[in-house]
Structures are given as C-alpha cells and as structure tokens.
C-alpha cells in the first residue's frame, strides 16, 4: 500500500465513523417532529420486514406531529406494532389509514439523558477515530520497515495522520455540541 492510498483509506474510514455518528444522532428525539425519528422502524409486511418508508408516506404537518399515511389498509395494524416495538416513546393514534404520532415535550431530566447519550455516541466515535489512527501508524511503521518510506517521511506522515485525526475529532465535537443545543432548546 502506498502513502497516498493509505491517507485516502484512513480519511474514508474516518468519514464513515462520522456518518455512523450522524445516523445515531438522528435517532435521538429532540422534542420536534422529524421523519428521521422513524428511520429505525421496521414493519412486518408481506412475509418480511421492511422499512416503514416502503409501506407508508411520512410527513410532519406541524412541529409536534408526524403523520404516517399507510398505503395498504391491511398494513395499518402492523405499522402501529412496528412503531410501538421501536420503543421511541411515541403513541400512535389511528384514523383509518392515517396514523398520527404526537411528539410529547421532553422533560428536563429526559433532555439531560439524551445529552449524555449524545456525548457517549461522540466518545465512541472518537475511540473509533483513535483506532483508525493506530492502524494507520502501524501501516506506516510497516512501510518504513519494508524500506518503502524513509524515517523522516514516516515522521511527516505520522504527523499528517495525527492532524487528520484531530480534524475529525473536532468535527465530532462540533456535531455533538450542535445536537446538544438542539436537544436543550425548549
């Protein structure tokens, strides 16, 4: 593996770690209606599990409600069940093929729990970044040992790997800070 490929590979892995964090944070309820809350909901449909978005239309008519318009009348009860099983703290209110999900306001205590959870996700992502950095540094040592790169180049590339790690770590911090503000906004 050459040095350019190594840098791109590390950057790609760090980018994936950041995307995983984004996905985890989307699942945290902020007290505002967002169809992203339902990304993790799967529904038993036609003999297999399907994402909710493949059996219904999702919309947010206001800041406190999510509407789920089920396309097939026979699917309404399994959509309700899927939403309940997802354990999102939402109570479905069914009206024909339309399921309304009122978003309850968050208590201060629940907001604090969500902030702690967001910080935990951030810390897990930083651990992933450090593991990626460690793997990159081990690869650099191997390249130096195999005489593919010189000692000074190894040092220079190690600094670049560290800078890349620091950059992504600060991105994680800013994403978490932004999510914290979103959660704490009443």
From Swiss-Prot:
Compartments it resides in: Cytoplasm
Keyword Ribosomal protein set for record: no
GO biological process, one term: cytoplasmic translational termination
SUPFAM superfamilies: Ribosome recycling factor, RRF
InterPro entries: Ribosome_recyc_fac (IPR002661), Ribosome_recyc_fac_dom (IPR023584), RRF_sf (IPR036191)
Annotated Gene Ontology cellular component terms: cytosol
One Pfam entry name: RRF
Main localization category: cytoplasm
Gene Ontology MF terms in the entry: ribosomal large subunit binding
Entry keyword set: Cytoplasm, Protein biosynthesis
CDD domains with a match to the protein in the record: RRF
Job description of the protein: Responsible for the release of ribosomes from messenger RNA at the termination of protein biosynthesis. May increase the efficiency of translation by recycling ribosomes from one round of translation to another.
Family named by the database record: Belongs to the RRF family.
PANTHER family, A to Z: MITOCHONDRIAL RIBOSOME RECYCLING FACTOR PSEUDO 1, RIBOSOME RECYCLING FACTOR
Protein name from the UniProt record: Ribosome-recycling factor
Source organism of this protein record: Rickettsia massiliae (strain Mtu5)
